[in-house]
């Protein structure tokens, strides 16, 4: 408890010294101390809807081991900056065996690094990808599950444009920058 208070002290001091605060969501504003609400404006980060828009001719090949993908293919996407429990990676991986069994034509593309952004690495594995593959990997057809690491923003947009289903899991938090 004292350690957490110390970690938050600089934020509270900064809030107290501020004339105005900006946050992208009401949820995030509501996590601030009540006394900070009157000086807090909620302004969403915004999305460039000219650039982030459907493209019926979108296609993508991210690496030689996966098939070329295009609009109309049964593509399921999961994107995080880093693959970790705070962003639902463990839930997604545990759901994959049943999902792939129910959808025999589906290709799954998983985007994200192998470090952590919000939590800790697992104790018995080098990263959460390795931990979850140890748990469910034998139940997966890995020729249909593609871990592509971090990708360029242009590739990310194409991936979302061809995605039939984009899975976004997170604990109550803010909308992930990897989704914007």
Where are these regions (language model features)?
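Short alpha-helical donor nucleotide-sugar binding micro-motif in glycosyltransferases
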Residues: 150, 158-163
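Carbohydrate-associated surface elements
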Residues: 27, 46
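Acidic donor-binding loop of glycosyltransferase active sites
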Residues: 19, 161-174
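Acidic anion/phosphate-binding donor-loop and adjacent secondary structure
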Residues: 47-67, 158
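Nucleotide-sugar-dependent
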Residues: 83, 169-180
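Nucleotide-activated donor-binding/catalytic signature segment of Leloir-type glycosyltransferases, i.e.
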Residues: 112-116, 120-154
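Membrane-proximal helix-turn-helix segments that form the acceptor-binding/catalytic region
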Residues: 2-21, 135
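Conserved donor-binding/catalytic core segment of Leloir-type glycosyltransferases
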Residues: 22, 64-87, 93-96, 108-109
